């Protein structure tokens, strides 16, 4: 039986995102909400050829009551800089529909962002070929979760520029840029 991208993502979540992490305050996990989302069957993974087109399609019918997280994943890698720019543009548009999109590209990741807690681990992908991912979630749900994490000091390990880009800018989009 061959391993799918979905299998690999689930393995990554179990072994990296859901486990206690000594680099985070109080040993929190890298993604404190991941385990519950999986247990509640709130994660849907779509393996596709064109990750950008599939993300647009998934955003068009995204329903957080059906799945709080949709992951579009593909072996067909767009250029890393283009993916980053596309994600920023998509969020400017999608925020009006309470949708937030995050991207992962194997050529640009946690190491460049100095997010040690995401890459200093023993996990290895079971797949030989790299893949990219687009994460689709409710903007308000992600922002509400980040408020809870802020209270617990979660973002204290983030470099200031990453915190601003990942948390503050997202919050500004949610609030129509009324948040300073």
Each PLM stretch: what is its role?
Residues 1-180:
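Expand to "…catalyze enediolate/carbanion chemistry for C-C bond making/breaking, isomerization
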């Amino acid at each position: 039986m061959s391993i799918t991208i979905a299998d690999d993502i689930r393995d990554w979540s179990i072994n990296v995102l859901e486990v206690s992490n000594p680099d985070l305050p109080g040993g929190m996990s890298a993604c404190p909400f991941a385990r519950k989302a999986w247990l509640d069957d709130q994660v849907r993974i779509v393996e596709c050829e064109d990750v950008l087109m599939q993300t647009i399609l998934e955003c068009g019918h995204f329903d957080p009551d059906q799945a709080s997280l949709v992951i579009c994943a593909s072996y067909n890698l767009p250029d890393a800089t283009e993916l980053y720019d596309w994600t920023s543009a998509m969020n400017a548009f999608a925020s009006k529909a309470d949708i937030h999109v995050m991207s992962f590209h194997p050529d640009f990741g946690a190491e460049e962002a100095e997010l040690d807690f995401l890459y200093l681990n023993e996990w290895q992908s079971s797949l030989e070929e790299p893949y990219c991912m687009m994460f689709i979630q409710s903007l308000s749900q992600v922002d509400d979760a980040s408020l809870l994490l802020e209270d617990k000091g979660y973002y204290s390990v983030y470099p200031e520029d990453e915190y601003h880009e990942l948390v503050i800018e997202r919050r500004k989009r949610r609030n129509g840029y009324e948040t300073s």
